[in-house]
Curated annotation (Swiss-Prot):
Keywords: ATP-binding, Helicase, Hydrolase, Nucleotide-binding, Nucleus, Ribosome biogenesis, RNA-binding. It comes from the Eukaryota. GO terms for cellular component: cytosol; nucleolus; preribosome, large subunit precursor. The keyword Hydrolase applies. This is ATP-dependent RNA helicase drs1.
Length: 801
């Protein structure tokens, strides 16, 4: 009987075998830590198994296997395990407790890789507190009075929220008093509203057919340019449709139309997808009881190894849609030799950290190992993890290429699955070079999956990724928002764009007082707003690319834990982030495109919850607002307008103007602190170089696939994708023609300048008298007969008088 036992052991690591006993034995063999007692334990196990086989006692063994949590493939056993699993889920209710525990940011994986230096970041709150202490010492109490006023406003706003049945229903009263124009934004004052009564009446006549809803629903604003833009958009769509349709038909795999309706019922639960028990237990711990539409469509297709192009609205569970099939496939991998098989690429560090947390929790009942490789974390820690050959690598493109070129223990030849989250952003110009470098290095025989809320339909972009007849899975209509999202727009009349910060402060102090993300287009605007919020007594944190990774983590943790009510962020936080309990998103100004707008407002109203997005829009933002309103009306989503009294916004704007000097002083003090910190770091760096000169010089030089010039060009393209072309003209040496244009422009700005006319050029007019005076005074003698000198007498360098 001993030889038969050895044969069974030989087949433990194969993919096709399915004996539950072999899997349990394989797990048990990895558990013992004492090598000396292994032989004795194996012998005792062998003798015990032979005795049991002789006495034909197999049922107790099967019961033990079931208790350990791994089932066989027998139909009766499978049904029993599934019923027990269903019962466990029902005991937990809807899984709400687990879901609440899961939704927080998981920074454990990121904190392990933080650089262990003693660098101290400059804290704006400390600078503001320091200045307030100085003012109190000198007898200035104006700032303290302002804080009391703001705190009273916050308390009043919070009381209103408690009286309301839900967090955002108390605002409906303002919605009823909205302006009737299409843009939905009432005039800031009585004079402005009276001046635009005629245009409002025309707008109402043009929109009678569309305004069938109640008064709380706003319609897009008619504009002289809107009709032309709509016509051009329709023409472009008509021209592109036949060609693009032909490309898609040839590129994508044909859609399989279900013959029977019973097939859709099979994927209404995770148990019907033939997932393994460890994966089902991981889904239970996270709190996922039923698959979302994108998950029910994607998981069965991805388990077959097909390439996938998936799209769904924000907050619909796209991360789990590709993580679950990846984990299921990895459960049946050969485990004898550790091998990295999956790479998941994200455009931002925060999104990669969040995906790492989700995947780690879903795989908590498996032996699958993960590695987080993003910028801002320690290279040494990541290299040590990659040396162990983790099964899944979750990374940003830049750090992935860095390890690919400079980490000797990291190889990409064994990758079998590539996932691109937020694929439309990864395919843009800013990431194009890095993505091409990765795609040309990893094996071509792989499974590729692309996911995004605004998935590109251009086949030309998708061809670059190397997809092989991908299956297109678009659950919701493209460029749509969540159905539970209410979109608000506040219109800034021409001439009031400078009061934008006043409107924002009014909203944050009186309307939306907690769990708010405010998006800005530039880092300097977000940082300046952070100072203004601090001086106004509003608790806020910031999140943008100029912060270190440690600062980013602390900032988001403070917002998540409720220590700060406002998160002032750039588009760095607009994609994929799932922060628990975000009630409101405010756009300080409309973004560059409608796609970015969809990702911004997708930070709220996630997973079926309600939320509200408010956009402060001026005339330059009309294009994006028009696209958002048009898409919302097509979808049937609620779009409302909010009217803020001009006096309220003006009072807050005046407070901001009074803070101007103090803001500049804080920025100056912050800059000085940064210079001091930089100097201290340079001193430590020099000391380390002296102490460890031989080791530092012995390190191999890190390489990159681009030159510095190419990196700057790629960075510039990425900025233009988000904020448009900034600056317009190229910097460099000016030509004489450009210099003359600048001189002429400067003269025109200085005032009215006299210019020669036709008479002056002919020697008549004003110049005739001047020439006569010059002849009397002397100088160059005139020609014969008092006529003008002959042309040959002039030299090439002489100037015309």
């Amino acid at each position: 009987m001993a030889p038969k036992r050895n044969r069974d052991d030989d087949f433990v690591l194969t993919l096709s075998d399915n004996e539950g006993e072999d899997l349990t034995n394989a797990v048990e063999e990895e558990l013992p830590l004492d090598p000396s007692s292994n032989k004795k334990r194996k012998r005792s196990d062998d003798t015990a198994s032979t005795k049991k086989s002789k006495k034909s006692k197999k049922k107790p063994e099967e019961e033990d296997v079931e208790e350990e949590g791994i089932w066989g493939i027998k139909d009766a056993d499978d049904g029993a395990m599934d019923s027990d699993f269903e019962f466990a889920l029902e005991a937990d209710g809807t899984g709400g407790a687990d879901l609440e525990e899961f939704e927080g940011w998981g920074f454990d994986g990121a904190k392990k890789g933080l650089n262990g230096g003693d660098k101290k970041a400059v804290d704006i709150d400390e600078i503001i507190a320091r200045r307030r202490e100085k003012k109190k010492a000198s007898g200035k109490k104006g700032e303290a009075d302002d804080e009391v006023m703001v705190d009273q406003d916050d308390a009043a706003a919070s009381n209103e929220e408690q009286d309301a049945p839900e967090g955002i229903d108390f605002e409906d009263e303002d919605d009823e008093f909205m302006a009737e124009d299409g843009f939905g934004m009432g005039a800031g004052s009585a004079e402005e509203s009276g001046a635009e009564e005629d245009s409002d009446a025309e707008d109402d006549e043009e929109g009678e057919d569309d305004d069938s809803d109640n008064d709380s629903v706003a319609s897009p604003a008619p504009h002289p340019d809107d009709a032309a833009s709509e016509a051009s958009d329709e023409d472009e769509d008509m021209d592109d449709d036949p060609e693009e349709a032909a490309k898609r038909e040839a590129f994508f795999a044909p859609e399989e139309k279900p013959v029977k309706g019973a097939k859709q019922e099979l994927n209404t639960t995770f148990q019907s997808m033939s997932l393994s028990r460890p994966i089902l237990r991981g889904l239970a711990t996270v709190g996922f009881t039923q698959p979302t539409p994108i998950q029910s469509k994607t998981i069965p297709v991805a388990l077959l190894g097909k390439d996938v192009v998936g799209g769904a609205v924000t907050g619909s569970g796209k991360t789990a849609a590709f993580v679950v099939p990846v984990l299921e496939r990895l459960l049946y991998r050969p485990k004898k030799v550790p091998t990295s098989r999956v790479a998941i690429l994200m455009p931002t560090r925060e999104l990669a950290i969040q995906c790492h947390a989700v995947a780690t929790k879903l795989a908590s009942h498996t032996d699958i190992k993960f590695c987080l490789a993003v910028g801002g974390l320690s290279l040494k820690v990541q290299e040590a993890e990659l040396r162990l050959r983790p099964d899944v690598i979750i990374a940003t493109p830049g750090r992935f290429i860095d390890h690919m070129r400079n980490s000797p223990s990291f190889t990409v030849d064994t990758l079998e699955i590539l996932v691109l989250d937020e694929a439309d952003r990864m395919l843009e110009a800013g990431f194009a070079d890095e993505l091409n470098e990765i795609l040309t290095t990893i094996p071509k025989s792989r499974q590729t999956m692309l996911f995004s809320a605004t998935m590109s339909s251009s086949v030309d972009n998708l061809i670059r990724v190397g997809l092989n007849r991908p299956v297109r899975l678009l659950v919701d209509s493209q460029k749509s928002t969540a159905g539970t999202l209410v979109q608000e727009f506040i219109r800034l009349r021409p001439g009031r764009e400078g009061k934008r910060m006043g409107y924002l402060l009014y909203l944050c102090a009186n309307v939306y007082t907690d769990r708010v993300i405010v998006f800005f287009r530039q880092k300097k605007e977000a940082h300046r707003a952070r100072i203004i919020f601090g001086l106004s007594g509003l608790k806020a944190t910031e999140l943008h690319g100029s912060m270190s990774q440690e600062q980013r983590i602390k900032s988001v943790e403070a917002f998540r834990d409720g220590k700060a009510s406002f998160l002032l962020a750039t588009d760095l936080a607009s994609r994929g982030l799932d922060i628990k309990g975000v009630d409101t998103v405010i756009n300080y100004e409309a973004p560059q495109s409608h796609d970015i707008y969809l990702h911004r407002v997708g930070r709220t109203a996630r997973a079926g919850r309600s939320g509200r997005a408010c956009t402060i829009a001026a005339e330059p933002d009309r294009k994006v607002v028009k696209a958002a309103v048009k898409a919302s009306r097509t979808q049937g989503a609620k779009v409302v307008s909010r009217v803020i009294e001009a006096s309220e916004a003006d009072s807050w704007s005046e407070k901001v103007d009074e803070m101007a000097d103090e803001i500049e002083e804080i920025l100056k003090e912050e800059k000085e602190d940064k210079i001091l910190a930089q100097a201290e770091m340079e001193v430590r760096k020099g000391q380390n170089f002296i102490d460890h000169e031989a080791e530092i010089k012995g390190r191999p030089k890190r390489t990159w696939f681009e030159t510095e010039k190419e990196k700057l060009a790629a960075k510039k393209l990425g900025v233009e994708e988000l904020n448009g072309v900034v600056g317009g003209k190229k910097k460099g040496k000016l030509s004489n023609k450009d210099k003359k244009k600048l001189d002429d422009k400067g003269e025109r700005l200085e005032g009215r300048v006299w210019k020669k006319g036709r008479q002056e050029r002919d020697g008549k007019g004003v110049l005739a008298k001047e020439k006569g005076k010059k002849k009397v005074k002397g100088g160059k003698p005139p020609g014969p007969g008092g006529k003008k000198p002959m042309r040959p007498m002039r030299t090439g360098g002489a100037k015309r008088k």
